[in-house]
Amino acid sequence: MIKERTFLAIKPDGVQRGYVSDIIGRFEKKGFKLVGLKQLIPTKQLAQDHYGVHRERPFFKDLVEFISSGPVVAMIWEGEGVILSARKLIGATKPLEAEPGTIRGDLAIDIGRNIIHGSDGEETAKFEINLWFNQDEICDWETSDSEWRAEN
């Protein structure tokens, strides 16, 4: 069985405001498996590489400055449908458009401080996982309750 994985990053505002355990808990409760986790202050180069698709946009410089301004909690989550489910759990990019019950709908107000980043598709997830993690930082393990999470 191919395991779907996605990359998530709790941004400096989410770390500073103390939302790390709440956010991790939401994904654990949903039934996803955490296979990569680290906290770091991203270099400007890492931030530029991560947000390279926005390089020509007017907000690029501010985005790079913000993401490299403090600690980020980088994560790899695994599970069936994890990419789409994570996007739904995170909510709309603009927090004021995010539904209540989503991370951004519950915890964020401003688009420039929207708490969390999540991969938007399979190719992006692969790119971001490889950008932020070395292979030896990914822990491939089996949960003891996997038979209770989804039909095989």
Swiss-Prot record:
<keyword id="KW-0546">Nucleotide metabolism</keyword>
<dbReference type="GO" id="GO:0004550">
    <property type="term" value="F:nucleoside diphosphate kinase activity"/>
</dbReference>
<feature type="binding site">
    <location>
        <position position="93"/>
    </location>
    <ligand>
        <name>ATP</name>
    </ligand>
</feature>
<keyword id="KW-0067">ATP-binding</keyword>
<comment type="function">
    <text>Major role in the synthesis of nucleoside triphosphates other than ATP. The ATP gamma phosphate is transferred to the NDP beta phosphate via a ping-pong mechanism, using a phosphorylated active-site intermediate.</text>
</comment>
<feature type="binding site">
    <location>
        <position position="114"/>
    </location>
    <ligand>
        <name>ATP</name>
    </ligand>
</feature>
<keyword id="KW-0963">Cytoplasm</keyword>
<dbReference type="GO" id="GO:0006228">
    <property type="term" value="P:UTP biosynthetic process"/>
</dbReference>
<dbReference type="GO" id="GO:0005737">
    <property type="term" value="C:cytoplasm"/>
</dbReference>
<feature type="binding site">
    <location>
        <position position="59"/>
    </location>
    <ligand>
        <name>ATP</name>
    </ligand>
</feature>
<keyword id="KW-0597">Phosphoprotein</keyword>
<dbReference type="GO" id="GO:0006183">
    <property type="term" value="P:GTP biosynthetic process"/>
</dbReference>
<dbReference type="Pfam" id="PF00334">
    <property type="entry name" value="NDK"/>
</dbReference>
<keyword id="KW-0460">Magnesium</keyword>
<dbReference type="InterPro" id="IPR036850">
    <property type="entry name" value="NDK-like_dom_sf"/>
</dbReference>
<feature type="binding site">
    <location>
        <position position="11"/>
    </location>
    <ligand>
        <name>ATP</name>
    </ligand>
</feature>
<dbReference type="InterPro" id="IPR034907">
    <property type="entry name" value="NDK-like_dom"/>
</dbReference>
<keyword id="KW-0808">Transferase</keyword>
<dbReference type="GO" id="GO:0046872">
    <property type="term" value="F:metal ion binding"/>
</dbReference>
<dbReference type="GO" id="GO:0005524">
    <property type="term" value="F:ATP binding"/>
</dbReference>
<feature type="binding site">
    <location>
        <position position="87"/>
    </location>
    <ligand>
        <name>ATP</name>
    </ligand>
</feature>
<protein>
    <recommendedName>
        <fullName>Nucleoside diphosphate kinase</fullName>
        <ecNumber>2.7.4.6</ecNumber>
    </recommendedName>
</protein>
<keyword id="KW-0479">Metal-binding</keyword>
<feature type="active site" description="Pros-phosphohistidine intermediate">
    <location>
        <position position="117"/>
    </location>
</feature>
<keyword id="KW-0418">Kinase</keyword>
<comment type="subunit">
    <text>Homotetramer.</text>
</comment>
<keyword id="KW-0547">Nucleotide-binding</keyword>
<dbReference type="GO" id="GO:0006241">
    <property type="term" value="P:CTP biosynthetic process"/>
</dbReference>
<feature type="binding site">
    <location>
        <position position="104"/>
    </location>
    <ligand>
        <name>ATP</name>
    </ligand>
</feature>
<dbReference type="InterPro" id="IPR001564">
    <property type="entry name" value="Nucleoside_diP_kinase"/>
</dbReference>
<comment type="similarity">
    <text>Belongs to the NDK family.</text>
</comment>
<dbReference type="InterPro" id="IPR023005">
    <property type="entry name" value="Nucleoside_diP_kinase_AS"/>
</dbReference>
